């Protein structure tokens, strides 16, 4: 019983300690939550105060920077530039960095395409010709560098000769001139996009309902989506701030190079737009939208301009509303305007800039001609005639003088220039016949450039003809060397065949020697067998001789004994003694022969 009570007491103490620890943890966590909430509230108040100061300063700058009505035509561009710089808001650092990195390759490609469109067609044609010609020597130099080196001095000398022959000096100079003229023509055009203007002097809004723009789709919760393309402060696009995926798709009046957009919210009892995203496309409906930029608007009830870092050609825009200021129930948007340049305006701007360039060239040519006339008046008539001949030759030879000459002839004819006539009207648009006249003048300039190209190509053909002749001579020398190498290779092949034949003969001789050696070994074995037989016979003969010798010795001893003892007994019988004597003599004779 006592043990059970002690266990219950211990359990109660443990449960009390755990509950006390939990209560302390909850108290600490609640205090931290309240502290963090207070810090967040103070930071939001400070941010809203800073945004309000920025909005006031921006409003003051806009009110001070409004131009007068009398100077609208002269100062409209400067005021728009200052207003764009003052009211344009940069995107968030994280989003902008990602967007800039993602659009770096596309911006480079679009800039190169715009440069090629703005450059004169004559320069483009010449540039293509020069680039196609430059590729040949570069490929030749690469092939020469990849060849197997023999002697260092010979290879370096041949490479230098080939480079000097393949790259004439005139080609590089012409290419540098073309690139310089291209840079000069692009210096005033690529820096910025000049917006299309209306006849009244205002910027042309491609997202206006009066121009034909439409709102194609929006999210289900949105109401009054078509109000943002009508400039009416009492109408607006309304969305509950709690909804996600708020968007609006707008069809522009024309296919446009969009450069700037303007948004505004004039409704006081609503939350202002903060972060938004702009997408574009040329075809609708589509699954792939081109990202144009992410922006952050100020918390203010005024119009705000946003300029794209990389303008692109689009027909449909999609506005994604990402976040908002404040804590109102509705998020509204009163205005959306789009500014840029359409394809026709872009082409006319290029033509006007090219025409200005030609006028400057004509003025420079006139000044040079006046200076030359004053210098010629001081000199004698004979020198004047000689110099005039030389100048005519130089003008016929140089392509730039030919172009200036043709332009001066066009000026003397005093053809009407539709570009100059309509350039003084900034808000007007050229009719179709004036565009055709401009295109005809463009075709004439292209004809002049083609004649220049023909003369240049003739000179290049002569130079390259000489180079090709030298290359033919070198090729003939190389062919002779190749023929000698072929003969040497054939001799080497014959020698190889002879060595193969000798090797075959050596193999046959070796086979013969091997067969003879085999025969000799067989005979040797036979001789060994015969010698063994002879040795065996000799051994047998020796044994036989020993046996005969022993027998003869035995019979000899018997005969001696018989003769010695029988002489006294058998004296009377003479015939018996003679037989033993003969036996003794024959045995001694045999022993003597065997002893030899």
Curated annotation (Swiss-Prot):
Q: Does the keyword Endoplasmic reticulum apply?
A: yes
Family annotation (Pfam families)? Sad1_UNC
Q: How does it sit in the membrane?
A: Multi-pass membrane protein
Q: Where is the composition biased (Basic and acidic residues)?
A: 366-396
Q: Which cysteines are joined by disulfide bonds?
A: none
**UniProt-annotated location(s):** Nucleus membrane; Endoplasmic reticulum membrane
A single GO cellular-component term on record = endoplasmic reticulum membrane
Q: What does this protein do?
A: Encodes a member of the mid-SUN subfamily of SUN-domain proteins that is localized to both the nuclear envelope and the ER. It is involved in early seed development and nuclear morphology. [TAIR].
Summarize subunit and interaction data from the UniProt record for this chain.
Forms homomers and heteromers with SUN3. Interacts with SUN1, SUN2 and TIK.
Question: Per its record, how is this protein called by name?
Answer: SUN domain-containing protein 4
Q: Which gene encodes it?
A: SUN4
């Amino acid at each position: 019983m006592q043990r059970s009570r002690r266990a219950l007491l211990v359990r109660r103490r443990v449960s009390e300690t755990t509950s006390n620890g939990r209560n302390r943890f909850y108290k600490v966590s609640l205090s931290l939550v309240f502290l963090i909430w207070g810090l967040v509230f103070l930071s939001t108040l400070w941010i809203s105060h800073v945004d309000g100061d920025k909005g006031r300063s921006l409003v003051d700058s806009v009110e001070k920077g409004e131009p007068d009505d009398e100077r609208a035509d002269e100062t409209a561009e400067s005021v728009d530039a200052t207003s764009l710089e003052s009211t344009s808001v940069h995107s968030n650092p994280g989003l902008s960095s990602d967007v800039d990195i993602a659009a770096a390759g596309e911006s480079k490609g679009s800039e190169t395409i715009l440069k090629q469109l703005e450059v004169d067609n004559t320069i483009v044609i010449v540039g293509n010709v020069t680039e196609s010609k430059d590729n040949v020597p570069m490929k030749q130099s690469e092939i020469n560098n990849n060849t197997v080196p023999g002697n260092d001095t010979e290879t370096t000398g041949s490479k230098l000769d080939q480079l000097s022959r393949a790259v004439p000096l005139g080609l590089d100079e012409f290419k540098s001139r073309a690139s310089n003229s291209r840079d000069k023509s692009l210096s005033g055009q690529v820096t910025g996009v000049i917006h299309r203007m209306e006849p009244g002097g205002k910027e042309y809004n491609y997202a206006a309902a009066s121009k034909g723009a439409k709102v194609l789709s929006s999210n289900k919760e949105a109401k009054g989506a078509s109000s943002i393309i009508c400039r009416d402060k009492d109408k607006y696009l309304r969305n509950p701030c709690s909804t996600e995926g708020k968007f609006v798709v707008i069809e522009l009046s024309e296919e446009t190079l969009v450069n700037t957009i303007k948004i505004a919210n004039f409704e006081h009892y609503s939350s202002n737009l903060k972060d938004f995203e702009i997408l574009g496309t040329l075809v609708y409906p589509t699954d792939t939208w081109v990202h144009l930029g992410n922006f952050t608007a100020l918390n203010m009830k005024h119009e705000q301009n946003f300029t794209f870092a990389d303008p692109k050609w689009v027909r449909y825009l999609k506005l994604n509303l990402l976040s908002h200021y404040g804590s109102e129930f509705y998020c509204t948007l009163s205005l959306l305007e789009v500014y840029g340049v359409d394809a026709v305006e872009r082409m006319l701007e290029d033509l006007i800039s090219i025409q200005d360039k030609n006028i400057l060239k004509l003025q420079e040519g006139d000044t040079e001609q006046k200076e030359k006339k004053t210098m010629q008046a001081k000199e004698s008539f004979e020198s004047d005639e000689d110099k005039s001949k030389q100048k005519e030759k130089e003008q016929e030879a140089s392509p730039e003088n030919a172009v200036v000459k043709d332009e001066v002839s066009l000026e003397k004819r005093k053809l009407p220039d539709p570009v100059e006539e309509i350039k003084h009207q900034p808000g007007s648009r050229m009719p179709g016949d004036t565009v055709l006249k401009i295109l005809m003048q463009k075709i004439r300039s292209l004809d002049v450039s083609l004649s220049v190209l023909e003369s240049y190509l003739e000179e290049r053909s002569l130079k390259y003809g000489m180079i090709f002749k030298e290359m033919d001579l070198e090729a003939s020398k190389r062919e002779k060397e190749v023929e000698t190498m072929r003969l040497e290779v054939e001799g080497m092949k014959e020698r190889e065949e002879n060595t193969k034949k000798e090797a075959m003969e050596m193999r046959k001789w070796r086979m013969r020697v091997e067969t003879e050696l085999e025969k000799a070994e067989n005979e040797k074995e036979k001789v060994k067998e015969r010698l063994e037989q002879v040795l065996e016979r000799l051994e047998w003969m020796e044994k036989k001789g020993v046996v005969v010798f022993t027998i003869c010795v035995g019979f000899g001893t018997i005969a001696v004994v018989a003769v010695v003892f029988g002489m006294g007994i058998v004296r009377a019988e003479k015939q018996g003694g003679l037989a033993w004597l003969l036996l003794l003599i024959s045995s001694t004779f045999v022993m003597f022969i065997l002893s030899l």
